[in-house]
């Protein structure tokens, strides 16, 4: 099931790069609101859709409570079959093409069972789109999480 189209991947990433990083976990709610994300009972999770059964954004933090990365499932193979895996693969290709159009060639591009593509962005952050047979994941790495790609 495609949860979010490629343009959402691009729009959210471009908006995230505009934020004044570093941002503390407790200071993130107004920024989440700018993305249209709503708070949940957990301080490191935000709801992206009105449907509470759909994925939430999960924030990763470092010891200083600064956000270092964000994770969001963009598509899921709910049928767990080959057709669903093929649909995920097609969605991965669409998202990589959208990323190439927005930011140029990825510095990381891996094919195979667990494909991935990643881009260095202007503010020292990174966007990564990765997948497999069961889900596709958007990962935005803030400048505070740079070491994840060192």
Where on the chain are the PLM-derived regions?
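Short helix/turn-capping signatures at newly exposed starts of structured segments
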Residues: 1-113, 123-126, 132-150
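Long, hydrophobic, well-ordered secondary-structure blocks that form the structural core
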Residues: 118-119
């Amino acid at each position: 099931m495609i949860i979010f189209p490629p343009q959402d991947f691009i729009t959210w990433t471009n908006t995230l790069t505009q934020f004044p990083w570093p941002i503390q976990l407790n200071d993130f709610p107004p920024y989440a609101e700018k993305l249209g994300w709503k708070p949940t009972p957990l301080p490191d999770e935000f709801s992206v859709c009105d449907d509470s059964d759909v994925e939430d954004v999960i924030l990763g933090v470092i010891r200083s409570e600064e956000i270092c990365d964000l994770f969001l499932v963009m598509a899921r193979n709910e049928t767990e079959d080959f057709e669903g895996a093929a649909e995920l693969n097609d969605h991965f290709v669409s998202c990589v093409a959208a990323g190439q159009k927005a930011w140029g060639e990825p510095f990381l591009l891996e094919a195979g069972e667990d494909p991935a593509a990643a881009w260095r962005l202007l503010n020292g952050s990174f966007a990564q789109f990765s997948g497999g047979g069961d889900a596709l994941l958007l990962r935005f790495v803030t400048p505070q999480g740079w070491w994840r790609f060192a």
